[in-house]
Amino acid sequence: MTASDRVVCACRDKLLIMQTSRCLLAILNLTILTVLSCYVARADEKRLMKAVVAHDYGAPDVLKFENVTQPEPKEDEALVRVIASSVNPADPLTLSGKYAKEWGTHLPLIPGYDIAGIVEKTGAKITRLKKGDAVYGYPTFGGGWAEFVNVKEWEVAAKPKSLTFAEAAAVPLCALTAWQSLVTTAHIQDRQTVLVHGGSGGVGSFAVQIAKARGARVIATASTANQDFLKQLGADVAIDYTKTKFEEVAKDVDAVLDPVGKETLARSYDVVKKGGIVVSLVARPDVAELEKRALHGASMWVHPNTGDLTEIARLIDAGKIKPIVTQVLPLSEAITAERQAETHHTRGKVVLRIADEPKRSNL
């Protein structure tokens, strides 16, 4: 082989090596891109969650069960993995768009003002909560009908230890409403008398129990079918509003809790003693009627409060308050649950199961 032949062979070998290297590099790059794409896809998949979403205002039929992006907590928020939520009278109002201006809510929206779950992640400014904590509470702007929701620290408290997550999810909004109406606003004390309208409903069932826990005498109204239920809750006097006018039985009460409004509210002023109070959840008590009888009045607007939730949990664990769960449905059946809520004749609460109950016994 001549010198020129050896040069040609060497050049060919170098060219072959270069071509092989380029092919290997291309294969390596393709492999890296494929791995990265799979990793990103998996990461994106992890950031998705199941939720019930409304893209329009309207009836329960606007709700859709779909995949949405999992929220990331801000520095003053905690991410909660939701085990259960429940249905409230506020949900149809939210879906109707009633709160859009007052609360600044925007579409699409996820309903759900009750949650019970486990803290998954905390923001830098969260000091009380930590990952793994079992909590229950009331997210101010909803979002509970999903696998994850962000909450402020003051919107949740430690879950009552004696309750399952499904039971705990039936508590926050309705129990807070009853507590802030009777304890914070009306200052119910031992041996006072309280009239609770709609005593078998979500708020009413808690109101009867809270008033009894405070040592009050309780008169409650409900339909014929719920008379025994009122007694089970602890009501001293049960009135069947379909047969008897409540003002024929209730006299000189210290406080009235009204979740009905209209005629029921208008007739309630006459049964309250001088200096007593009428608390309405749906309307502003008539100032002229109050002044004429020397009464106090309040229109109730519930808000999340860790202290109140903690006190409610204490009474629950002491056996003085018990949530009434009438039905547990999977999250995918939220439309069915919402239709039941719109009837306003549900006894206690309907719960939405979002995940299985954790097996840890200390939660």
Name each region found by the language model:
Residues 104, 108, 121, 137-198:
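NAD(P)H dinucleotide-binding glycine-rich loop of Rossmann-like/cofactor-binding domains
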Residues 69-87, 99-142:
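Glycine-rich beta-strand-centered segment in the early N-terminal region that forms part
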Residues 248-255:
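A short acidic, Gly/Pro-enriched loop at the edge of an enzyme's catalytic core
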Residues 169-240:
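Mid-domain Rossmann-like dinucleotide-binding core that forms the NAD(H)/NADP(H) cofactor-binding site
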Residues 47, 309-363:
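C-terminal hydrophobic helical "lid"/dimerization subdomain
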Residues 26-37:
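Bacterial N-terminal signal peptides
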Residues 259-321, 354-363:
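Glycine-rich phosphate-binding loop and adjacent beta-alpha segment
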